[in-house]
Amino acid sequence: MDIEKAPHSFRRSFNLAMLTVAILGANALAMAQESSQLKLRDILGKGARQLSADEVQQLLPEAKVMSVGARGVTRRWRNNADGKFVASGYDPTTTTPRMQNFQGQGSWHIGDNGKYCVMLEWPRTTEQWCRILFKLDDKYYAVKSADDENAVVHELEIRH
């Protein structure tokens, strides 16, 4: 059937149906991504342990850090001893080639109770957070609160 030759009311209904399918598909994907995110209880159940403030102090200076977000955005930096760093990022979801690769200036410090604190000034936004670090096998995870077992954890690759 040639949609261009169909009556206007049919084309409008068809377009609305296609839009509805697209919205429902996007919502289902977003819900699946959210429900598939690791929670603190998941890693604790596998034996993860919270790093002490001393362990964090030994781990972070001069460490190379990489994180991959839920949408596949990759960010990398190296924690310089002076508390500053230059970060680079790659966003595979953008359709603007010049925005796929980006850089930002940042700083880091170890906060209260050994929390890893980062401030990043990206070209379009500023990101600031403090996270508690956990270790499971050879992987590190960052979480906002160790008291909330439903808190989403973010895997960080930390190496020297």
What do these predicted ranges mean?
Residues 8-16:
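N-terminal secretory signal peptides and thylakoid transit peptides that target proteins
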